[in-house]
């Protein structure tokens, strides 16, 4: 079994930089397996697993799928209390969760090695919509919490399985501590061999179907949602805000697993961010079209999506709807506000003069809807890091409104129900300092026998309440249909 880098190369890397860990790796052929099969093997041996995948706008599969299991640590935070849990210990701290996350990342700082994918280990999980109360402590968010998810749930994975979809290879990655390097390297050789044996010969977890025991019930019926829109428009007329995003939640009783729903989503709604999580906070599946923020080698990107139409039944119908969407002054105005907000958010942590709009108002097509999309870029300041990027941008303007803080206050008042994972950030912070997170939309999450789906619509001065209610329904369609189809039965 060939392992790179060698022990001698690791010694040189450790001597050249102040690294806490170094990733070593080996490869297997993957032409007779799939990411879903690997996931089921991992679910057999660990209750904490993830799968991150990607598909481009033209439905080509992204190069890498990332899988992980058996985390070293789990960091959770709820209402200011942070718990750090390992296999043997658990402690709760009232200190700043961001400081705790930074300490963990500093202890595990890693070099970026040539030939390895963008993610080789780090923290994987979510920051909820309500995480803004930690980055903006003067903001009061006191809505009811009926779902019971954490404000932050991040798991530290030192083992990563990267599925190279182009080369049809599995890259098995293990991060080793740089203290006692020789001992740790030889221990890691044995662990990589164990990972190899698990993937080649491991049993798959039992297939557990998904079953909805009740129909979905909305948090707000059409009349209640339209009334909420009218109240929001009053705030707009009074000058409090220019725009606000109001969401609606669907809830049903469920038994079984969401894995089959994810299998449906990844084939019927391929998206830039597709994810499956299973952990102490339940299951999360989704196919999000929208980046919250990406940081790679010092360059920041965010991709505002705002302005929506349903997909047409034919290519000609699509083209007509695209033209209609781009000509709609209400949609263009909403999009421009959110591009400006994205520039402002990126600008908080970027070097002066580096913020620019790279792509402006292009049409992005997805399975059930189309959006207007733009790309905002900046170069991060030397004194800022990945967590600063999350602080600056979460929640995205496309899920809150403008001005952002006042919009969040109005959402708290009108919805009066904690959003939890919806509208937050899902993804990873790498040991190398890189970050890739999507906005937590087009997702379902389950806990304690219930499954939740949320969607929202952007409200501006001339919004038609009934139309905004229908937009919410359209945005939830792909996830609802995936859950319905998963019930029809899938081969194990």
Give the location of each predicted region.
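Extended alpha-helical targeting/anchoring segments
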Residues: 1-492
